[in-house]
Amino acid sequence: VLALCLAPWLVALPDAVAAQGTAADPRLGSGPAPAFGLEQMRRADPLDMRQSLPVTQPDRRPQAVRGTGGEATAPMSAIDWLDALTQAGIARPGAGGAAPFDDSGDIAESALAPEVRTLTLSASDAGAVGLLPASVTGLPTSLWEGAETAALIRRIERLEVDRLPAMQSLLYTLLLAEADPPDASGPQTEDDPLLLARIDKLADLGALDPAMALIERAGQTRSPALFARWFDLSLLSGLESQPCRRIATDPDIAPSQAARIFCMARNSDWDTAALLLETAGALGTLEPSEERLLTRFLHVDLDDGAVPLPPPTEVTPLLFRLSEAIGEPLPTSDLPRAYAYYDLRGRAGWKAALEAAERLARTGALPENRLLGLYSGGRPSASGGIWDRVAALQAFDAAIGAPRPDRALVRETLPPAWEAMQDARLETSFAALYAGRLATYAAEGDAAGRIALRTLLLAPDPTDHLDAISPRTPTEAFLLALARGRPDQVEAPSERARIVARGFSAETELPPRLARLIDDGLLGEAILEAMQLYSFAMEGNVGDTAPAIAAFRALGLEETARAAALQILLLDDRG
């Protein structure tokens, strides 16, 4: 069911998949470049994610074993897909208002369950799964055609998009797009390496919900590799009940002996869990850290007066959850970003949840509204650091969110809030939340007006609010022209601006390697190469700036080119 697969941060369907313009030569000219139709898609207003219960040590009292008819597991994501379609202004086929009830259709003749027929996905079908169809992304299903799988995986693994908002949006589109494997006609195996790489990259970004949705679309039990990833991500999401029930019915699918023992205990099968632990300990099949944590987890009588265990040398999702279950939680700040997801539930306190939310928001893995909800979750209990940021944002949000905002109060609270979000490197999250409401302030000549204009320029759709704004300085004139994709119409006010403008010039040539990828029709690999070039530019390699922007335009990604160019100029104070 698609509604269960979509993560709350997933972009809403655009009103239409708009073409991004046409030009005689896709690599030349300052006008809009031809497009595959890919837009920088808008994020839907998300609902709160499910707050799962913590893992606890097993209750030794006799309990009835839950079968498949037991308590239903809540969906992985709380978003209602049909509501999302309605909010996006898209009607379901045949939906023309409320239809009268028609009881003339098929009527059941028996209370027996109907026969259910299943169809196993082929390896190529499993590798092509995605959450965004071609009609939404504008990318063809042949996105990866012709490329070497190993080369694509290397590019995806080494691509860093932390604090590169335009690249984050594009990368999520690539990772979630429905597209055939690079060699769908070749020998097939139960695992598609590119699919596994996509899942791993989503987890690396902290986007656990879409990663799990991809696994479910491909089939959680299709292969040991997919099940192992499903098990690990379920642990970090607090949704391990489903994989543990699978392990209870099919022990051989367990990714490890430790996982099987944990799931037996999680399913209240104490005797089996204890027997497995004793046997594994005698045979030496468990890592020392696994054996220590499982022993403490299963033997509640050891808790009182027990010496705290040393932290595991190599933390895994299972060891992380076991540590939390015995009352010795591990901090997530030094762990991979996926572990921060677990802190969103507030089990480690509001401060830890705020820090986790900011960490995930920097990679676009957390919806802006969820971030705002956590910022608004209480009153700061101290001053300094993140508490000053919370106080500043709360004051501004209260001012601009009033039924009749006091414009003087909004102008007073905006600069501190903006500075606070700059400190957190979350300017684009702030822009996504408030740009629309700040549009009427952008024409004012004070500090708040300048911040409001910058917020509009960093918003997902800057041109929606710029028509009524007159530039006050040469810099503002250039930025406004750049947002419209016409930087050649005004004089660049600085050397950096001139470099950016060259990305929209007919004279800018692409690097030979990138031009060859485009000429050979290797669309997906060419996009990844352009993204890597842009990341080098943001790291300080000025010579890569214009070619990177020109590459996006040559690939038809005009919206991405404009957003990337604006972010180079507006976020370059990050260092």
Question: For each of these PLM feature ranges, what is it?
Answer:
Residues 2-12:
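Bacterial N-terminal signal peptides
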